[in-house]
Amino acid sequence: MTVKQLSVFIENRQGRLGEVLAVLKRAHVNILSMCVADTTEYGLLRLIVNDPEKGKDALLADGFSSMVTDVIIIKLPHHAGSLSEILELIAAKNINIDYMYGLSVDGADASVVMKTADVAAAEAVLRAGGIATMSAEELAKL
């Protein structure tokens, strides 16, 4: 099950991240998770939000370059090495992981957001391995 991630390209300058977040606030888009990757010139903000299309539209209207991408949210079992075991399943099928970042949804369980070169293949591997993922419907209830 894929979930939509909102990505925003932002200039790497003081206050720019706050401007993006203010646009989302005005649009009543709730942020569930985010990560920022930066270079000297620009940053890439990746967000899991309650309404990615609404967020994208609000940001585009305000002049921010943004897009929506399919990602997988994996529910991590609570034992040492659980993420390592999941990554071994993915690697065994030669699926490249583009990036990952954490997501905490209820304070008890951990999850990770994963973007792969082949999202459908990664989903199939996870499903076959009995690994729980989060649907967009589950995410919407948070």
Where are these regions (language model features)?
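A conserved regulatory-domain signal marking ACT and ACT-like small-molecule sensing domains
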Residues: 1-142
